[in-house]
């Protein structure tokens, strides 16, 4: 391995004993061998530590470094520790229950060199519980400015995930994943995009994302206060740059507000429980009809959903349930 690897692959591990070895194998099978793998064990209560140790003892690889944190600290803390330890020029953050396809690094770096982008996003395959796959790409293939990418991210026109892209590590100087209970990926990515010169999107599925009910955002109800903290984070990120007062910036923040409360409402409707009615009521008042009408013009699906949530939660529940079944095959 070169003194400075091209890519640092940061993989948090928590309660994924059944999948983590396959995830590690998918990294070690990369056609681009110039990487380091940082395995960040987050106080995992299962036998992940033992399985990883046994595998690496049988298959030693100098590119792999394991950090065994006995106390659970959360996903953001693990990624931040990985960033502190990373030596690569680029970083990526696969989950330990997913898999990289063999050419993940090779193809993303090819497009980075071709376009000069500081972030390259790829498509991914969603692998359902029955083994079927569906290709998904959020965004239009091509290259955007960092500002354009930031606004597109807020409007849900680009992938908000940490695992389907490579990012120049220099963009994380002064940037870390916040301790927020939802969308911490999107928060850090927004800050990176606001620093980036250009961002490229490619229509090549290079990542396999395992879909399960527990892995989706509606597997639990996020407290309303966390949604407010998320929106405050978005606003402060734009305020630190010249983008906050731009009309496009304000539009993006408005649409992000509608989307954030829609997502929170979806959790309440699907999960249910004692807290659901209060959360649902807070989501319905979290954005205005004017906000929804603006979203209707720019992001029609979200605008229509926002207006529907404000007028008929029963119909909204029915339509969203049909959407989940169609998209995720659950």
What kind of region is each of these model predictions?
Residues 253-263:
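Amphipathic alpha-helical repeat scaffolds of TPR domains
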Residues 9, 82, 139, 150, ...:
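Sequence-pattern detector for short linear motifs
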Residues 188, 230, 257:
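Catalytic-loop motifs flanking and including active-site residues across diverse enzymes
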Residues 269-330:
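Membrane-interface aromatic/basic loop that binds lipid-linked glycans or pyrophosphate carriers
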Residues 249-250, 312:
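Residue-level recognition of alpha-helix termini/interfacial anchor residues
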Residues 1-227, 308:
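Nucleotide-sugar donor-binding/catalytic module of glycosyltransferases
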Residues 166, 238-243, 306-314:
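Juxtamembrane/interfacial segments around transmembrane helices
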């Amino acid at each position: 391995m070169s003194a400075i690897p091209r890519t640092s692959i940061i993989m948090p591990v928590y309660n994924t004993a059944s999948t983590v070895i396959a995830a590690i194998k998918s990294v070690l099978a990369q056609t681009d061998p110039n990487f380091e793998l940082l395995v960040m064990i987050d106080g995992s209560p299962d036998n992940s530590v033992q399985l990883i140790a046994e595998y690496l003892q049988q298959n030693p690889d100098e590119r792999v470094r394991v950090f065994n944190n006995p106390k659970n600290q959360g996903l953001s803390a693990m990624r931040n520790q990985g960033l502190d330890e990373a030596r690569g020029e680029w970083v990526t953050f696969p989950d330990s229950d997913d898999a990289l396809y063999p050419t993940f690094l090779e193809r993303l770096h090819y497009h980075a060199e071709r376009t000069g982008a500081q972030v390259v996003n790829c498509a991914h395959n969603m692998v359902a519980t029955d083994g079927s796959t569906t290709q998904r790409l959020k965004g239009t293939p091509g290259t955007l400015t960092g500002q354009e990418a930031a606004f597109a991210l807020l409007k849900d026109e680009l992938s908000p995930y940490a695992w389907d892209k490579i990012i120049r590590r220099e963009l994380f100087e002064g940037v870390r994943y916040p301790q927020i209970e939802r969308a911490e990926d999107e928060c850090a990515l927004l800050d990176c995009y606001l620093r980036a010169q250009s961002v490229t999107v490619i229509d090549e599925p290079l990542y396999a994302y395992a879909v399960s009910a527990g892995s989706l955002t509606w597997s639990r109800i996020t407290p309303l206060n966390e949604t407010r903290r998320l929106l405050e984070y978005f606003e402060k990120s734009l305020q630190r740059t010249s983008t906050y007062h731009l009309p496009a910036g304000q539009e993006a923040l408005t649409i992000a507000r509608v989307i954030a409360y829609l997502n929170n409402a979806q959790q309440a409707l699907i999960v249910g429980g004692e807290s659901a009615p209060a959360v649902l009521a807070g989501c319905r008042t979290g954005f205005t009809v004017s906000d929804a009408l603006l979203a209707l013009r720019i992001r029609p699906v979200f605008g229509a959903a926002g207006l529907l949530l404000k007028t008929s939660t029963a119909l909204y529940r029915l339509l969203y349930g049909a959407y989940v079944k169609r998209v995720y095959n659950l």
